[in-house]
Amino acid sequence: MKLKNIIALLSVVIVLGASAYGYSIYKKIFADNISFSEREIFIHIPTGATYNQVEEILEPHISDMSKFRMTAEKKNYPQNIRSGRFLLKKGMNSNDIVNALRQNVPVKLTFNNQETIEQFAGRIAQQIEPDSLSILQAITDNEFLTSHGFTQETAISMFVPNTYEFFWNTSALQFRERMAKEHRKFWNTERTAKAEALNMTPQQVSNLASIVHKETVKVDERPKVAGVYMNRLNKGMLLQADPTVIFAVKKHTGDFNQVIKRVLYKHLEVDSPYNTYKFSGLPPGPIAMPDISAIDAVLNYEKHDYLYFCASMDRNGYHEFAKTLAQHNINAAKYQRWVSQQGY
């Protein structure tokens, strides 16, 4: 065989070998490497994770770790690990997976109606990386609260219920600073001016709003309920709000899981500044986290002459309002008879 034929043959062999090798590499990089059956899943890589830890997190979700490892090394992923929340989709190949691990997907963080700052910290810890203790320590730090005009009692009013976008690996300190910023944004010039017109601070508005929030779930009724409490405050009357008594009992016993369906005379005797049957004015802080509709209901309360209200037996969730104690007692008696007939 002539030399040039040998060279040609060797060239063909080399090309075929290179092609075969290239194809095998291609298959490893671009073949489907997902093992789960769901359409998509999220995985979470903690702050400071090593490459080995990333593999452990991925192990249940990919078909061939060696294929992923080879691709990750070629794309320098082990030297550039990012913490966060990442989206994996069915049908992804190893190249797709590495690319996905470089795209931190935000969390739509939500919260509402927590009664205590501890409950709030627990709710947030379910949605971002820091644990509830680190979040609680961050948001109850005295220096932080004082710098933003809050106390331990009013701290919960800093957090305005809504949906916010956060990266999962947001730190506790970053979270609290963002929330302080959102609070300032919420209390814009218009809302602040309305609070000043009521001779109230934003914290006092939130305080009263928490009572309104607990009194009625009917958003359209909240301005009317707020009007009752504004009338009582302006007349120097006790608020006598049942939700404050329930909160006072829970705080006094340390049990916020207990369910109190009806306020009894024994509950009215609890010695707590949150008991508005015994102590005048607003309680020291919110009895829950009021939502935006309750805050705006106080700022835009309905002007009327009502001083009392009780649950309505005819309109589920709504209340009957009265201008005099005599009329209120009639309304309350009707409701109590109805409750007794229901066997409650």
Positions of PLM-derived features:
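Conserved catalytic or metal-liganding residues and their short signature motifs at active sites
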Residues: 1-250, 288-293, 297-305, 313-344
